[in-house]
């Protein structure tokens, strides 16, 4: 696939950086982050500014353009993809490698003295702004807000912002009403003497009001802001979508509710003016809560003396701890998902030897089987369907130019998931339809040992996710191997497939302790550039663990796998497993057989059931 030609776009952007219509004084550098005004990871087409300018469309990356340079920072998931998608105008900055400068240090090294660095304040997170501004200031430069987004000025066919209908969720799915959620939030606000809370993250707003949307592909969210006071609720949302009868009834808009639960509906774009007006009337002691990941524009609308920033909002933390209705829904969703994947893998085993299955047709088939399941809404992210060398591109998405045919000679990796009304799934399986090489089996077995080490871990209550990351890497490290991504991320309940504040990563940002009810992924991998990729991913639920003793009465936790899809034993060097690891695998496969087998039977999917039974035969080491 040829990289995007960007010379003319960069020329126009540099011209805009000097245009007095957009900037009071010329700027010498312009920063283009990945996100939108809500700092979302996955964004609508109208917000894909970095991809438009550079050609690189991965979910994480920051572009910086100066008069002479164009540089792109991204992480290890996207090194190969970014290198292929960008032309030679761009320098790829590989984050996490010791020779790669930070964005701030690079700017200081290339900018002329006293430079002005511009950025759209609605898109830049507050914590990023503070860090960048401090370094630039100490080097004699200035970070300046540019209120007109310069990319929008040169993007002549920029798509419209979506404004799609809303979906209401009942108590069967949510377990708790939106009024109760607001009441719980207000209790937390009162504990901290907070008068107002500004909600900017789209998944937090969707969760708070038990609403879902489809404004962002694969993410059931809708463009909005919310402000919650101790006696007031404001929802900033465009279109007439709250006027739909079901939504009106759900939000109780027609009822003469007591004032504290009456929702004022306001235009989406009025958030800054309304927030400034609200802050103008604050008494000296009143505080306004906002995430430090909210945009700089939103934070700056709140006077410093009244602003109370936090890394994780109370909604973010409450949303991460699933209640019993949400946990049960996630279990149901994963059983349905397993049925679809059993169908897929049975189909692949029959069709791949015939030579007509491609990465794209396999991904399409996975979606076809998922669509047959009850309450299917959408995929949860674009399917990563990759064979042979494409598997080494961690977040690869097949397109016609790169679409390989699955064969009996290559490792196949599929990372896929779905949004069902009762839950969100994310699962990766790696398989071989012929005979894997000894080296492929060796690497797969190291990854499996890491996967089991995390899944079977028992750890004290209060443990933070980053402390478990080395469990997943230990077998790889022993052989001098590793992978350049985190081991796990939080998963929403019919919400975003990636959510905070919990995760399992070598980066210590996974700083919220794991607690019962949180749902994360367990997904170690290994990638051999130009050859193959291996990843084994389950979604797991944090649950209390039964232990012989209970030190200091603190309790212990472990994981319950929600994903119930067989792990291909053909890829395993069984003799390299310990007895304990064999026991874990056999127990896991027995659960897959019992739980998913029952559902396959009830849906009359006999061939897939036979495949499941074959794939869950016990394994044993040769002693």
Swiss-Prot record:
A peptide binds at residues 77, 395, 489, 498, 523. Its cofactor is Mn(2+). GO terms for molecular function: aminopeptidase activity; manganese ion binding; metalloaminopeptidase activity; protein homodimerization activity. InterPro entries: Creatin/AminoP/Spt16_N, Creatinase/aminopeptidase-like, Creatinase_N, Pept_M24, Pept_M24B, Peptidase_M24_C, Peptidase_M24B_aminopep-P_CS, X-Pro_aminopeptidase_P. Homodimer. One of its GO terms (biological process) is negative regulation of programmed cell death. This is Xaa-Pro aminopeptidase 1. It catalyses: Release of any N-terminal amino acid, including proline, that is linked to proline, even from a dipeptide or tripeptide. Keywords: Acetylation, Aminopeptidase, Cytoplasm, Hydrolase, Manganese, Metal-binding, Metalloprotease, Protease. The modification N6-acetyllysine is found at residue 304. Belongs to the peptidase M24B family. It is found in: Cytoplasm, Cytosol. Metalloaminopeptidase that catalyzes the removal of a penultimate prolyl residue from the N-termini of peptides, such as Arg-Pro-Pro. Contributes to the degradation of bradykinin.
């Amino acid at each position: 696939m040829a990289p995007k030609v960007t010379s003319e776009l960069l020329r126009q952007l540099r011209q805009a950086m000097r245009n007095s219509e957009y900037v009071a004084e010329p700027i010498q550098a312009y920063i283009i982050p990945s996100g939108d005004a809500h700092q979302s990871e996955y964004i609508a087409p109208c917000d894909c500014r970095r991809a438009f300018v550079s050609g690189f469309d991965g979910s994480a990356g920051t572009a910086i353009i100066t008069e002479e340079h164009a540089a792109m920072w991204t992480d290890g998931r996207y090194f190969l993809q970014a290198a292929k998608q960008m032309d030679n105008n761009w320098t790829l900055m590989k984050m996490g490698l010791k020779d790669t400068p930070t964005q701030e240090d690079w700017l200081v090294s290339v900018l002329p003295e006293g430079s002005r660095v511009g950025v759209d304040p609605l898109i830049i997170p507050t914590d990023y702004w503070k860090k960048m501004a401090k370094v630039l200031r100490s080097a004699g430069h200035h970070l300046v807000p540019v209120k007109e987004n310069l990319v929008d000025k040169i993007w002549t066919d920029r798509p419209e912002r979506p404004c799609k209908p809303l979906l209401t969720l009942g108590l069967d799915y949510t377990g708790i009403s939106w009024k109760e959620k607001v009441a719980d939030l207000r209790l937390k606000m009162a504990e901290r003497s907070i008068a107002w809370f500004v909600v900017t993250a789209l998944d937090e707003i969707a969760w708070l009001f038990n609403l879902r949307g489809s404004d962002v592909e694969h993410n059931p969210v809708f463009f909005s802001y919310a402000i919650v006071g101790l006696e007031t609720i404001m929802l900033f949302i465009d279109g007439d979508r709250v006027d739909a009868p079901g939504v009106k009834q759900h939000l109780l808009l027609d009822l003469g509710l007591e004032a504290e639960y009456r929702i004022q509906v306001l235009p989406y774009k009025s958030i800054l003016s309304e927030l400034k007006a609200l802050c103008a009337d604050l008494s000296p002691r009143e505080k306004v809560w906002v995430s430090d990941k909210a945009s700089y524009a939103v934070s700056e609308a709140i006077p410093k003396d009244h602003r109370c920033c936090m890394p994780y909002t109370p909604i973010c933390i409450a949303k991460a701890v699933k209640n019993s209705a949400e946990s049960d829904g996630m279990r149901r969703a994963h059983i349905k998902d397993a049925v679809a994947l059993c169908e897929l893998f049975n189909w692949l085993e029959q069709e791949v030897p015939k030579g007509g299955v491609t990465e794209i047709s396999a991904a399409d088939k996975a979606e076809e089987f998922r669509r047959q399941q009850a309450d299917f809404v959408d995929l949860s992210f674009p399917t990563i369907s990759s064979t042979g060398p494409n598997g080494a591109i961690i977040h690869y998405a097949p397109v016609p130019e790169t679409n390989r045919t699955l064969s009996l000679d290559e490792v196949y990796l599929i990372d896929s998931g779905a949004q069902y009304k009762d839950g969100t799934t994310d699962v990766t399986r790696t398989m071989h339809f012929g005979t894997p090489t000894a080296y492929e089996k060796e690497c797969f077995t190291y990854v499996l040992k890491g996967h089991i080490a995390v899944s079977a871990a028992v750890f004290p209550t209060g443990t933070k996710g980053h402390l478990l990351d080395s469990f997943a890497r230990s077998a790889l490290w022993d052989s001098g191997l590793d992978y350049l991504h985190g081991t796990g991320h939080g998963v929403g309940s019919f919400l975003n497939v990636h959510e905070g504040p919990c995760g399992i990563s070598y980066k210590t940002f996974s700083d919220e302790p794991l607690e019962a009810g949180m749902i994360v992924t367990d997904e170690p991998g290994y990638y051999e550039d130009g050859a193959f990729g291996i990843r084994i991913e389950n979604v797991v639920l944090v649950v209390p663990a039964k232990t012989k003793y209970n030190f200091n009465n603190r309790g212990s936790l472990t994981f319950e796998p929600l994903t119930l899809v067989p792990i291909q034993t053909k890829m395993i060097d069984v003799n390299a497993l310990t007895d304990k690891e064999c026991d874990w695998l056999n127990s896991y496969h027995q659960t897959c057989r019992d739980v998913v087998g029952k559902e396959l039977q009830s849906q009359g999917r006999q061939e897939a059931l036979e495949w499941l039974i074959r794939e869950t035969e016990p394994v044993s080491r040769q002693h």
